[in-house]
Amino acid sequence: MEHIYKLLRSFKWDCAKYLYKNTLNFKVKRLRRKKNIRVLFAVAESATWKSDCLYKAMAEHPRFTPSILVLPDEQKEKTLLKEEVDSCFNLFCRKGYACTYPYQNGKLINIRKKLKPDIIFYQK
């Protein structure tokens, strides 16, 4: 019986590896076929922004459409959330980045439905 459980566990891991590998390969192949790749940089604070060179390189390339989404830091007080998002959003807009405001009608937007990014970089 022990031998059967061992075989089943091994089979389970082999199936999981196969599915992960093929799903990842499928997504990469699908992304490579796209003419325009939407890249979203999700940033919680302007001080953590370290992707300036990558953003500018993507902005210059005709195949990429980068944008920045300023996210509220949920670990801070609720009264400071909107103020920090506003100041960070204004900072990125002044620097000339394509920014998206995270609130619509007082609620956070659904990133997948509204922005439809192909690649998301999250910086905290």
Protein language model regions, located:
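Membrane-proximal basic amphipathic "stem/tether" segments
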Residues: M1-N36
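Active-site and donor-binding regions of nucleotide-sugar-utilizing enzymes
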Residues: L40-K124
